[in-house]
A protein has these predicted regions:
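Beta-lactamase-like hydrolase cores
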Residues: 17-45, 49-58, 118-127
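Extracytoplasmic
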Residues: 200-210, 340, 466-499, 508-574
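Conserved serine DD-peptidase/penicillin-binding transpeptidase domain
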Residues: 20-26, 76-345, 463-483
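Sec-dependent N-terminal signal peptides
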Residues: 4-13
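Small-residue-rich helix-loop
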Residues: 49-52, 303, 313-478, 483, ...
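Short active-site loop at a secondary-structure junction
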Residues: 52-72
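Soluble periplasmic/extracytoplasmic beta-strand elements of cell-envelope proteins
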Residues: 37-41, 101-105, 135-139, 167-169, ...
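Short, surface-exposed beta-strand/loop micro-motifs that present aromatic residues
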Residues: 92, 213-221, 420-428, 528-529
């Protein structure tokens, strides 16, 4: 009983067996270890683990959950999948006149925009339609998402990142108001009568900065037709200002934009907007396709596009379990797809909406690393290039610009209040690839978390492992002080070996107790205790990696599951 209490007290003060560089980064950050999950290993399913800290603890993932959504979509649909939007007609076309309705069925293409309208109108005209004596009917039944928004999440329901999904998406649900003060102009970028703009701006002869550089925007969406009020004083020296907000329903915006494009092309429409499913007997006119999925998921990852991720989740639900798509179907689809790949062995994550804009999503570093490893082995660089490239593009373009990490990391980031996460791959200077997952859920400040992540990733670039397939922390410097070595016969001759393999079983802020060391002796292990930043217990030496790895499993089972292989000069211990 006494031994159990002593061991429990010892383990309570024990620091997980982490490489010195990572230990130092954590200490520098002043973030409690309980707030941090780390899982770093050689890339690939059989890669050796380098660092593990709370890797099985559920965390708020924020946008790194998109990795699961994106990978499941690629597995199910393929890189070349394209979203469709189908155009039908009812009635007949006589002498260039459609006596019937133009019917549009949306299947959730999140990229459909006003830039697609010229091509769509051209194909309508090419079908022999010069005017439409009927309505424009929109079928948005492929998604069953209701009208709930995320205003309860952060009280910014009109911000583009909060845009909710719709099967008839248009311009990512964002309405753009163009303000040009030096021309005294306020216009809608795309014709849209589903909302009203009231211009109450006062132009003043002041420098374009501070409170004179941008309009005050007030939105009233309590009415059937939302109203936008532009208020305040703005410098007449300011250039164009684009106000981009979620103001109205995307299917309404699509209707007004399509109708305006048709009429501008000389195709008048006599009817109005109708919402219903495609009538039986409707004739297919043509199908408009999105860009390939590979392009879309790249934007989803690099720009962390929440709307795209939501649509991917819903699409998977419909493809797996039939229309209409629902969030629950989508969640189940992602779980089933990833389970089939064997990457949800340890714990089932809670995916929620697929984009990470949620306080209910939960994920472990280990599961995320498993997904990244599977994707790495299956698709290699094609997959990696979907993620943000350090110092080059996406959410880590500025973060690692001008650092040693530039062009050496492919990452997905995730940020919410009290959550700062990053996951992906790092290429070290010696050409090896590592899977890196760092999840920090803390109240100590996201800036501290970002700095910690940056330090660890920079350290990984300089990290040197052993021979092929060996993952080890930095070598202990020759100045490390030997504290104690037991008297069991060594496994390798110190006369002939310059370096040998060791198993680091623990790292302590205080010198480990005799009870802990006696446990190792009673198990028949050779060990050494060295001191640099912490007191580290190393079992070994072993002449080959195979010998060391055979022992590693036993130590992880009976001593410390965070134990790992390392490699040192034998002279350090003599």
């Amino acid at each position: 009983m006494k031994k159990s209490i002593v061991l429990a007290l010892l383990l309570s003060t024990m620091v997980w067996a982490l490489p010195t560089g990572i230990e130092n980064a954590i200490a520098k950050s002043h973030i409690p270890q309980n707030d941090i999950s780390i899982y770093i290993k050689e890339a690939g399913k059989r890669g050796h683990v380098i660092a593990a800290l709370h890797e099985n603890k559920m965390r708020t993932p924020a946008s790194v959950i998109k990795v699961l959504t994106i990978y499941a979509a690629i597995l199910k649909l393929g890189f070349d999948y394209r979203w469709s939007t189908r155009f039908y007609t009812t009635g007949k076309i006589k002498h260039g006149v459609l006596y019937g309705d133009l019917v549009v069925k949306g299947y959730g293409d999140p990229t459909l925009s006003d830039e697609d309208l010229p091509g769509i109108v051209s194909r309508i005209k090419a079908a022999g339609i010069g005017s439409i004596h009927g309505n424009i009917v929109i079928d948005r039944s492929y998604f069953k998402v209701g009208s709930r928004n995320t205003s309860g999440f952060d009280n910014h329901p009109h911000s583009p990142y909060n845009a909710m999904p719709d099967a008839m998406m248009f311009n990512e649900r964002v309405s753009t108001i163009c303000v040009v003060p030096n021309q005294n102009s306020v216009t809608k970028k795309v014709p849209d009568s589903s909302y009203v703009v009231h211009n109450q701006l006062q132009r003043v002869n002041r420098p374009c900065r501070g409170r004179y550089s941008w309009p005050r925007v007030k939105i009233d969406d309590s009415k059937a037709v939302p109203e936008v009020w532009l208020k305040g004083k703005i410098s007449k020296h300011c250039g164009k200002r684009n106000i981009c907000q979620v103001l109205t329903k995307p299917y309404k915006s699509f209707y007004y934009a399509l109708r305006a494009a048709l009429e501008n092309a000389g195709v008048p429409v006599t009817g109005t907007l109708r919402l219903r499913q495609v009538p039986k007997g409707a004739n297919i006119l043509f199908t408009h396709y999105s860009d390939p999925l590979e392009n879309i998921v790249s934007v989803t990852a690099k720009k962390s596009n929440n709307l795209y991720a939501r649509h991917l989740l819903l699409l998977l639900g419909a493809k797996m379990y039939g229309a209409p798509a629902t969030i629950e179907k989508g969640r189940r689809a992602v779980r089933v797809i990833l389970k089939a790949r064997g990457v949800l062995k340890h714990v089932i994550p809670h995916i929620d909406n697929g984009c990470g804009l949620s306080r209910e999503s939960r994920l472990t570093a280990r599961v995320l690393a498993d997904v990244l490893d599977d994707a790495y082995e299956r698709y290699g660089m094609r997959w990696m290039k979907i993620l943000s490239i350090a110092g080059v593009d996406g959410t880590i373009k500025r973060r690692f610009r001008g650092t040693i990490v530039r062009n050496r990391a492919w990452m997905k980031t995730g940020t919410l209040k009290h959550a700062k996460n990053i996951a992906g791959y790092v290429k070290s200077r010696n050409g090896r690839y590592y899977t890196v997952v760092i999840l920090v859920n803390t109240r100590r400040g996201n800036w501290r978390a970002a700095a910690l992540e940056n330090d660890i990733i920079k350290w990984m670039v300089t990290y040197r492992g052993g021979s092929s397939h060996i993952s080890t922390p930095k070598s202990v410097s020759d100045s490390s002080k030997k504290i104690n070595t037991n008297t069991v016969t060594p496994h390798v001759s110190t006369d002939t070996a310059k370096e040998a393999y060791y198993i680091q079983t623990g790292s302590f802020s205080q010198k480990p107790t005799g009870f802990y060391l006696r446990t190792l002796r009673e198990m028949g292990f050779t060990y050494s205790v060295i001191h640099d930043v912490n007191y580290k217990v190393l079992v070994g030496p072993y002449a080959t990696e195979t010998e060391a790895r055979n022992t590693l499993g036993t130590i992880r089972k009976h001593v410390n599951r965070g134990a790992f292989l390392t490699r040192h000069s034998v002279s350090v211990f003599n």
